[in-house]
């Protein structure tokens, strides 16, 4: 059971770190993170829409994040690397945060959800799903779903090719949860394959071979009549 508990503890710590970074880097457009163990310590890669805000003036903010990860979350020798998100429309976490901010500013949930989905699909995504749950229009909580394109919900493709993001919008009536799933344009589908047609070979031209056979069976020459008469 020691091995199982170790994996559970690692997963719980990663969830706490991600929650902390989401809260601290909300203005920077936090788009997710990745943690990997290296011989020199722990490599923490932060994906953000605005890397300059993550680094801070003179590297002050990134230094503070490094100290917090080491002291409060038990990350061994953290080394933070910041990477800019090239296409924010394909980052599910960034789009979920934008949708939550739109709901907090008073956007109607149908308009906000369809606007986010349309922006993702116009960027060339293969599929997008937006789920908004909470007290949307009345006292009762309900769920509204917007879907377009191709989305996998189970199996290995749902974990490998589907980008997932989650955010919370705090309103007067209560909390509204937002979930965004995106299948990027460069995702490789498991059922997509190409059939390579074999090149048709032209038939070889027919050649006619004419054989000339020489034989020794020649007709004997007839005797000359003049010779017989002279004799």
Curated annotation (Swiss-Prot):
Q: Which domain of life is it from?
A: Archaea
Q: Which GO terms describe its molecular function?
A: rRNA binding; structural constituent of ribosome
Q: Which GO terms describe its biological process?
A: translation
One GO cellular component term of this record is: cytosolic small ribosomal subunit
Q: Which InterPro entries match?
A: KH_dom, KH_dom-like_a/b, KH_dom_type_2, KH_sf_prok-type, Ribosomal_S3_C_sf, Ribosomal_uS3_arc, Ribosomal_uS3_C, Ribosomal_uS3_euk/arc
Q: Boundaries of each KH type-2 domain copy?
A: 17-86
Q: Where are its TM segments located?
A: none
The protein's UniProt keywords, in alphabetical order, are: Ribonucleoprotein, Ribosomal protein, RNA-binding, rRNA-binding
Q: What does this protein do?
A: Binds the lower part of the 30S subunit head.
Family the entry assigns: Belongs to the universal ribosomal protein uS3 family.
Q: What does the record note on quaternary structure?
A: Part of the 30S ribosomal subunit.
Q: What is this protein called?
A: Small ribosomal subunit protein uS3
Q: What organism is listed for this UniProt entry?
A: Methanoregula boonei (strain DSM 21154 / JCM 14090 / 6A8)
Give the encoding gene's name: rps3
